């Protein structure tokens, strides 16, 4: 079975600039996702789609395929499904291969376990699904989970009046 893993990593984050290459536990954030994808052994191919040369260089060093994303698909308002579709179509042409499944892994989930990937894929295979999205229960309203950096200090950007 040919399963394509797409990893979409845009450079233009407003909240945490260059977050996808910031080091977390000694590695660039994107490296965690690439390593998880490789360790899962579910994917015949892994492709990183990005508009950032630094991100693409990291991906190349880690031995995965890369795709330079167009400026049009790198804007703030572009939906992720459009980017995944573009990566899948271009990967099929580039690798001369038809994929049975396309699985996208978010860069911003470094705590994801390989077992999470396995369990999600098993659920997808055993169900009658066209799509499967993972998530987790938030401890508080996600609106209040947003952070920002000001003068090299990380803080919650929205606060309630509760004490």
Regions found by a protein language model. Give the residues of each.
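Aromatic/hydrophobic pocket-lining residues that form the small-molecule binding cavity
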Residues: 30, 84, 113, 117
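Short phosphate-binding loop-to-helix
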Residues: 47, 53-102, 119
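Histidine-centered beta-alpha loop that forms part of the nucleotide-sugar donor binding/catalytic region
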Residues: 10, 71, 136-137
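Catalytic metal- and UDP-sugar-binding loop of GT-A-like glycosyltransferases, i.e.
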Residues: 105
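N-terminal glycine-rich phosphate-binding loop and ensuing alpha1 helix
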Residues: 2-49
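Short, high-confidence coil segments that cap the C-terminus of an alpha-helix
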Residues: 43, 97-99, 126-130
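Conserved core of the sugar-phosphate nucleotidyltransferase
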Residues: 110-163
């Amino acid at each position: 079975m040919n399963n394509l893993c797409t990893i979409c990593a845009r450079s233009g984050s407003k909240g945490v600039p260059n977050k996808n290459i910031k080091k977390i536990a000694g590695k660039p954030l994107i490296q965690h996702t690439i390593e998880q994808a490789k360790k899962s052994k579910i994917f015949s191919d892994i492709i990183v789609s990005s508009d950032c040369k630094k991100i693409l260089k990291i991906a190349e060093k880690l031995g995965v395929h890369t795709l330079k994303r167009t400026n049009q698909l790198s804007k703030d308002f572009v939906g992720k499904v459009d980017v995944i579709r573009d990566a899948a179509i271009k990967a099929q042409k580039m690798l001369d291969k038809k994929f049975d499944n396309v699985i996208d892994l978010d860069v911003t989930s470094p705590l994801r376990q390989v077992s999470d990937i396995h369990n999600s894929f098993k659920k997808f295979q055993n169900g009658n699904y066209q799509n499967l999205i993972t998530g987790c229960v938030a401890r508080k309203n996600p609106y209040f989970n947003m952070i920002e950096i000001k003068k090299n200090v990380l803080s919650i950007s929205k606060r309630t009046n509760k004490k």
